[in-house]
Amino acid sequence: AHATSSHGLAHAAASVRIGVAKSTKPDTAEATEAALRQLASKLGGATPDVVLVVLCGANPQEPSPYDLEACLARLRVGEHALAASTKVVATTSCMGIAVESQWVGGNAIALMGICDPEGSYEVCYADASQGSEAVRERVAAAAARSGREEPPAVSIVFTQGHETTSLRGIQAALGEEAHLVGGCIFLANPPGLAVSPGGGGRDESATSGLVMLLCWPNATVAS
């Protein structure tokens, strides 16, 4: 049996910081920098272990003003640049985005940063057009990198096509009871998905497939 004191749980929860930020500036570099500045303030200057990025265009009938790869590059430079070790998972979207219980319609770049040095977080991209086995291999490899024996407490998934194939591959890697949250972003114009594993790993970006953020947080997660 294993028991954890309420003080221990409180300490674990206190060591985890989550912050969200946004910018509606129409220029990719300016919006990214503004969102980074806001995120740094929300996190009290702490270095996030992982950052989730959403580039939102206003109307799916018109191209978004934001460039995904330019945003990824901008995240790593400047006064509020992410650390080289920070992992990033990014996607494009459209119409609007919810940030801190507020609906932001139209163009926006939004960030969510998690500071949890005692937790484990991994990101991965998979080309779902190659079949569910290709997805399984990528997701299983990401899970193995964490060094955790148990499945992730929760995983965030964004897909661009091949949703059924993606889910089959994920479940084959993590089990059918895996806790998943996310969705399909097929209306994004242009479509885009990307991961930046940090630590010198190779960035990957594509217009289809799936990206995942696998989370083993240092806090209790209710199922």
Model-identified regions with their sequence ranges:
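Cofactor- and metal-binding active-site motifs of prokaryotic enzymes
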Residues: 9-223
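Intrinsically disordered, low-complexity segments
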Residues: 3-4, 13
